[in-house]
UniProtKB/Swiss-Prot annotation:
Pathway named in the protein's UniProt entry: Pyrimidine metabolism; dUMP biosynthesis; dUMP from dCTP (dUTP route): step 2/2
Protein name per the record: Deoxyuridine 5'-triphosphate nucleotidohydrolase
Family label: Belongs to the dUTPase family.
GO BP: any one term: dUMP biosynthetic process
Organism: Gloeobacter violaceus (strain ATCC 29082 / PCC 7421)
Keywords annotated in UniProt: Hydrolase, Magnesium, Metal-binding, Nucleotide metabolism
Chain sites annotated for binding substrate: R67, S68, G69, N80, L84, I85, D86
Amino acid sequence: MDPVRVAIQRLAHCFALPTCAHPGDAGLDLFAAHAVPLSIAPGRFTRVPTGIALGLPAGYMAFVQPRSGLAARHGISVLNTPGLIDCGYRGEIQVLLINHGEVPVVVSRGDRIAQLVVLPVPQVQFVEVSTLESSERQTGSFGSSGY
């Protein structure tokens, strides 16, 4: 598979460009790019700059997703998971981090704070119908597959 070329702009306060921790990883680590450490109190959230802007090609989008290690160790997640970046957005990528833990968490410049996943976007054409075809699941929703 050929790599997708994504334009990236390093802003003045950028710490590092997104990187994959391991070959073949789907998510690229995003780094905090603020000048002073930020403390996130339990139950609170804050916006963390990454110091980068993207030029996603037409037909692509990106998700900003939590890092599992931050969630497991500190209760830190991305508030609007997943954060959606459309191909036309050219501003700085910022991450809304929320502290679901019980103690304040300090985020410092250079910390890996989230993951960026770039995906193709299919063009959708809705076809209005009077009824939908049957399915095995039908209208089962929350908890329909068991608890």
